[in-house]
């Protein structure tokens, strides 16, 4: 699967293209979620509103306080089914509130374990194949 780099909505530097992909989240199939590929992140981080829209109950999930990207947020973990380019996988996602970003983060344990990813910054392209 090949994806072009994209502008990240809500950022001050809209002239930069970033490695971001549209992920279909189980429970909200008609609204693909823009996700930044974050090789430095261990976990997937999504806005908590995504869990609510997907019908995921976080009331019994343990909560952690996390500092990242210049803000502090409360995160609760739950498994989430996701699809990218026809490949579906289930991985843990930390749903965060507040979440001031207009995109989500895909990290090592929730994304990169499942895919072979080649970032081609010179041509603003991401080449992704599922791990077999």
PLM regions and their residue ranges:
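Pepsin/retropepsin-fold aspartyl endopeptidases
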Residues: 1-132
């Amino acid at each position: 699967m090949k994806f072009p780099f994209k502008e990240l909505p809500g950022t001050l530097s809209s002239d930069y293209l970033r490695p971001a992909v549209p992920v279909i989240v189980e429970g909200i199939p008609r609204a693909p979620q823009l996700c930044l590929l974050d090789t430095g992140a261990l976990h997937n981080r999504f806005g908590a509103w995504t869990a609510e829209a997907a019908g995921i109950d976080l009331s019994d999930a343990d909560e952690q306080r996390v500092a990242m990207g210049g803000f502090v947020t409360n995160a609760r973990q739950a498994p989430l089914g996701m699809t990218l380019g026809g490949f579906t996988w289930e991985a843990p996602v930390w749903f965060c509130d507040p979440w001031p970003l207009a995109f989500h983060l895909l990290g090592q344990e929730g994304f990169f374990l499942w895919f072979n990813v080649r970032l081609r910054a010179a041509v603003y392209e991401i080449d992704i194949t599922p791990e077999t």
